[in-house]
């Protein structure tokens, strides 16, 4: 009886060992199958990615080079282009060459004849007369007075008349100045005396002056 029990126990132990050995084999098979499926999936993913990348590259090339595709040249007329021009075209008009007048000898001769017949007017220079400068400090002497041919009584009155000082100026109050400025002032007629020119001698200037009976205060003093 004991031998049978031991035999049964041994058989059970062997069966368990066999079961344990079969489980890792299945796991290995399952793992190998899963690895194959993973590799297949990776290959599909890589293929899809490569296709997408190539498509994007093609789109970029189409955007960068829109006219990269070959286009057929279309001519407006089917016949060949002639290399020679048609003979119906009129010849080009040539402009006549105009010779300037100064190159022709006949025109030069006519111009010389005209110049000989009508000579150019030459401007005559004005003669420059010597001008004696006249200064205000110049004074009359007795010989100059005698050469003027003035009457003797007028000359004696000029010679014997003493020099009189100028009258003192009168100061007016401010009210009188205002009254004079407000009143209408009538113009006083004065005799026009010709202004002595520089080129005019003294004798000619004194001939224009009229004899004055009163005291004479001329611009030129008489030296005795």
From Swiss-Prot:
GO terms for biological process: negative regulation of canonical NF-kappaB signal transduction; negative regulation of inflammatory response; negative regulation of lactation; negative regulation of tumor necrosis factor-mediated signaling pathway; regulation of blood pressure; response to 11-deoxycorticosterone; response to dehydroepiandrosterone; response to estradiol. One of its GO terms (molecular function) is antioxidant activity. Changing residue 190 to E: In variants A1 and G. Changing residue 153 to L: In variants A1, G and H. It is found in: Secreted. Mammary gland specific. Secreted in milk. Changing residue 152 to P: In variants A1 and H. Residues 1-15 form the signal peptide. The modification Phosphoserine is found at residues 30, 32-34, 50. GO terms for cellular component: extracellular space; Golgi apparatus; Golgi lumen. Keywords: Antioxidant, Hypotensive agent, Metalloenzyme inhibitor, Metalloprotease inhibitor, Milk protein, Phosphoprotein, Protease inhibitor, Secreted, Signal. It comes from the Eukaryota. Important role in determination of the surface properties of the casein micelles. Casoparan acts as a macrophage activator, increasing the phagocytic activity of macrophages and peroxide release from macrophages. It also acts as a bradykinin-potentiating peptide. Belongs to the beta-casein family. This is Beta-casein. The gene is CSN2.
């Amino acid at each position: 009886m004991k031998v049978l029990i031991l035999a049964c126990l041994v058989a059970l132990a062997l069966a368990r060992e066999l079961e344990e050995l079969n489980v890792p084999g299945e796991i290995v098979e399952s793992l190998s199958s899963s690895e194959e499926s993973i590799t297949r999936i990776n290959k599909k993913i890589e293929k899809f990615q490569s296709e997408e990348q190539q498509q994007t590259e093609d789109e970029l090339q189409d955007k960068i080079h829109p006219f990269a595709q070959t286009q057929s040249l279309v001519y407006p007329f089917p016949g060949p282009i002639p290399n020679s021009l048609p003979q119906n075209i009129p010849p080009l008009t040539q402009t006549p060459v105009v010779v300037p007048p100064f190159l022709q000898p006949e025109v030069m001769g006519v111009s010389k004849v005209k110049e000989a017949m009508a000579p150019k007017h030459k401007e005559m220079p004005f003669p420059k007369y010597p001008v004696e400068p006249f200064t205000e400090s110049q004074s009359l002497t007795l010989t100059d007075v005698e050469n003027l041919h003035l009457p003797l009584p007028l000359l004696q009155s000029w010679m014997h008349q003493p020099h009189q000082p100028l009258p003192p100026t009168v100061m007016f109050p401010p009210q009188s100045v205002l009254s004079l400025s407000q009143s209408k002032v009538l113009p006083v007629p004065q005799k026009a005396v010709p202004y002595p020119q520089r080129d005019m001698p003294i004798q000619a200037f004194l001939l224009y002056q009229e004899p004055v009976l009163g005291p004479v205060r001329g611009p030129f003093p008489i030296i005795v």
